[in-house]
A protein has these predicted regions:
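… and, occasionally, acidic/histidine-rich disordered N-termini of signaling adaptors
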Residues: 1-182, 232-256
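C-terminal catalytic subdomain
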Residues: 122, 177-178, 190-256
């Protein structure tokens, strides 16, 4: 029988928690996150500003909260170290860099868990000057983008993390025009229920379509408040998380 050390979960662990994430100032964009936690679930986000790029991740790690946070703390260290390595030296091939970053996080999840550990995630690289978004959605709920053409869906394009040690993901690219908004939200928010129905992606889409929010923070608050209102005070069984990235309309004049 093969001796594979990463398949043996440690009996006892000094469980850790991830460090708080800072929101870097940007001249042409805004980013915000709103979070409403439950007793279970492992929603986690982090971001770094490296040169003219914002590198960010949003994960939904399966399992009980304490161990999910321990996994998140490990992933955070890997994310910050590898992102600095991959995105600091110009020129940067953003698609290759985000692919390598996701591969490193996938391996970290499996190694710290000692076995397969189902986790979905979204990893993105937003170039502030160009407005390009290079991303991998590893089994995560579909991201939504609102721009002058309406609301488009960025569907998951890769396998969930934590399942296969050497799985690689193909990065995708889109452009956020000035005034465009990117919205990421956790499965817990989409599945928030009242007595009859889930909140669902179509309600998220409706909120985004009709939103008059002028800031990323305002958009996050609006989406979360609609989800909580939909629940009519029912118990929250999973984390509700929302991340919004808004490219400011002023970015158009900044580039002229």
């Amino acid at each position: 029988m093969l001796n594979l050390p990463f398949l043996r979960r440690p009996i006892a662990l000094d469980l850790k928690k991830p460090e708080p994430s800072a929101f870097p100032p940007m001249s042409t964009a805004e980013v915000a996150v709103r979070y409403h936690g439950a007793r279970i679930g492992g929603d986690f986000f982090d971001m770094l500003s490296i040169g003219d790029r914002l590198i960010f991740i949003m994960l939904d790690i399966a399992g009980k909260r304490d161990f999910a946070f321990h996994v998140a703390a490990t992933v955070q260290v890997v994310f910050r170290e590898r992102a600095e390595d991959l995105f600091s030296a110009e020129p940067v091939n953003e698609a290759d860099a985000i692919t390598q970053l996701v591969l490193a996080m996938n391996r970290a999840i499996m190694e710290i868990s000692g076995t397969a550990h189902f986790s979905t995630g979204f990893a993105g690289c937003f170039h502030q000057s160009l407005g390009t978004l290079t991303y991998i959605s590893a089994g995560y709920t579909p991201a939504l983008v609102r721009d002058s053409h309406g609301v488009q869906e960025l569907a998951a394009n890769g396998l969930p993390l934590g399942l296969f040690m050497h799985a690689t993901q193909d990065a995708q690219m889109t452009v956020l025009e000035p005034g465009a908004m990117l919205l990421l939200f956790s499965r817990g928010l989409m599945e928030a229920r009242n007595r009859r129905t889930e909140f669902g992606i179509e309600r998220v889409r409706q909120v985004l379509t009709s939103s008059s929010a002028t800031s990323a923070e305002g958009l996050c608050s609006e989406v979360l408040e609609h989800a909580l209102t939909h629940m009519h005070g029912r118990r929250i069984d999973n984390d509700l998380s929302v991340l919004a990235l808004m490219r400011l309309a002023a970015a158009a004049t900044a580039l002229d």
